[in-house]
Amino acid sequence: MENNFDTICAIITPLALGAVGIIRISGEESFNIARKIFSNDFEIRKINYGFIVDKDNNKIDEVILLPFKGPKSYSGEDVVEIQTHGSPVIINSILELIIEHGARIAQRGEFTKRAFLNHRIDLSQAEAVLDLIQSKSKKSAQSALSNLGGYLKNEINNLKTDLVQIYSRVIASIDFPEDVLEVDKKDIVSICSDKILEIDKILNNAKSSDFIKDGINLSLIGAPNVGKSSLFNCLLNYNRSIVTPIAGTTRDTIKETINLDGYLINFIDTAGIRDKSKADLVEQIGIENSIRAINNSDIILFLF
């Protein structure tokens, strides 16, 4: 098992040819490692210009070095970010040098894990980081950014505070009936009912967030040759499905996604549904897949 608080490092930009690459170091040895490989003295929370050098003082690259003192950093620890030129050869050379000086490669998501363990973010914000990285539309990015900023966290904390206050009032009235005003049962029931509505709202918003993040599944369903594939191609604005006058041309489900005003719509073309006894084995399997598509759809568009 890895030590949760040793010093870790990773390339945090795509490893491909580009103008800039970024390497992050996080942990108590971050600054010491940076001092060993950076050509100049550096200041915390300043933009520092210089060179990365190896043990023989040979220059590897001209870089910008950004040190962040914990807990005011992404992970809550001492952090150093090194902006290099975007050559994979250069980036890997610097990463290897950092490892030689005592850091280890971070596991997937470990910087965010440390931010969570150091109470920089809560679980909802940690999940929002991944949602933001994987967002496929403006709406999903906005939703993730809202949660990263603490919207869901604040909603839950406010709800928790109110429920604890209600609980404390009830317990105090039971344990100290002579010293505490009697609790109005109707008042408590009314407050609890309001809180249940707030919980339902949070749960409904979570379901809506799933639609925003993963898209809405819309299946085109109907008998063979009613125009499902033609409509599918029209919606996509290019010929994705094969269209012929022959019944049963579409044998399997075909899924394509479009971005409609910031929302993802997953259009699903399906095999025509008809009496299986009139279909061959391959078409029968396609019909079964169409039925599964119906069960997994958010919206079903029947064509006749």
State each model region's role.
Residues 6-7, 17, 24-25, 37-39, ...:
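Conserved G1/Walker A P-loop phosphate-binding module
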Residues 97, 152-163, 218, 222, ...:
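Short secondary-structure transition/capping segments
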Residues 120-198:
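Long, non-coiled-coil amphipathic alpha-helical linker/lever segments
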